A protein has these predicted regions:
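Extracellular "spike/adhesin" assembly and maturation modules
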Residues: 1-33
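Solvent-exposed N-terminal domain segments of exported/luminal and surface proteins
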Residues: 35-87
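Extracellular-facing segments of soluble proteins and assemblies that are Gly/Ser/Thr-biased and enriched
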Residues: 96-182
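Conserved, mostly hydrophobic/aromatic
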Residues: 191
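Signature of long, low-cysteine stretches enriched in small and polar/charged residues
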Residues: 194-196
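Long, compositionally biased interface segments
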Residues: 211-267
Length: 267
């Protein structure tokens, strides 16, 4: 047996030629136990600088705006919390019924013509549940609110437009899938590959669904807007609000969506 181990434990024992006292062992053991107790204490999450359970609770700081945005029929309770300018989250308990209930989001206003923008990029990082029905997406508007461009980064449906969440479309398959029908497939632009859907919701809606879902990345929004323009959907629009959040159709029992890092860079 190792002479420096006590009863097989990892604490030091008596050294050769030294006087060994039981109280020394007791004091050492007490110190180890206290250290272990301290290390087991969880580090508390950073307290939010703002939170709201109001349907349209909103908050702004450093040019960024947050909105709880609970707008759908039959919506349940939801609380949005902001921890830092680029870090926020939402707890949402939405029933398992059809229709989008909410779009909690963070936003940044650009307010410039597309032709005068030399760069427009955004980075994201999020943690999302594995069940429910939802899509994490950019929602980009022109200043006149006549054009809405959605970029789905992660979602519970399928890239082909089928599943429990579907993009707005002029055409849906007349089969059990009821899938939205894309107008373009496998378009490589803005740093990813997308399927593109076109529809109308009181205004023109162009939805791009990533063919490979992800919880982190960087999107070249300028390149995507230029590609859409090249297809004749709009001219030199004035880019308005760039939003990022989650469209929640259902999150029964309450689910957490955490946005760990989100930013927009515009030049």
């Amino acid at each position: 047996m190792d002479s420096n181990r006590i009863n097989g434990a990892g604490s030091p024992g008596c050294q050769t030629g030294s006087v060994c006292r039981q109280e020394d062992h007791n004091l050492f053991g007490q110190a180890v136990n206290e250290a272990r107790s301290l290390s087991a204490v969880p580090v508390p999450a950073k307290a939010p600088i703002w939170s709201s359970s109001a349907p349209y609770g909103n908050f702004s700081r450093n040019g960024y705006i947050w909105n709880n945005d609970v707008w759908g029929a039959g919506a349940g309770p939801q609380t949005i919390s902001v921890r830092e300018v680029n870090q926020w989250g939402v707890w949402s308990n939405q029933p398992n019924t059809a229709g989008i209930k909410s779009y909690p989001h963070e936003a940044f206003n650009i307010g410039k013509p597309l032709s005068s923008i030399s760069a427009l990029r955004s980075s994201f990082n999020q943690d999302v549940p594995t069940n429910g029905a939802w899509d994490v997406a950019y929602d980009i508007w022109d200043s006149s609110n006549q054009h809405e461009i959605m970029l789905w980064t992660n979602y519970t449906g399928n890239p082909d437009g089928s599943g429990n969440v579907k993009p707005i479309s002029y055409h849906y398959r007349q089969d059990p899938s009821g899938a939205a029908i894309p107008v373009y497939t496998n378009v490589n632009v803005g740093g990813a590959t997308w399927n593109v859907f076109e529809g109308y919701n009181g205004h023109k809606v162009i939805s791009l669904l990533r063919t490979s879902k992800t919880n982190s990345g960087t999107v070249d929004i300028k390149s995507i807007l230029q590609w859409i323009k090249s297809k004749g959907y709009f001219g030199d629009i004035n880019v308005g609000s760039v939003q990022y959040g989650v469209e929640i159709t259902s999150s029964p029992g309450g689910m957490n969506f955490n946005f760990n890092n989100w930013s927009v860079t515009s030049k």
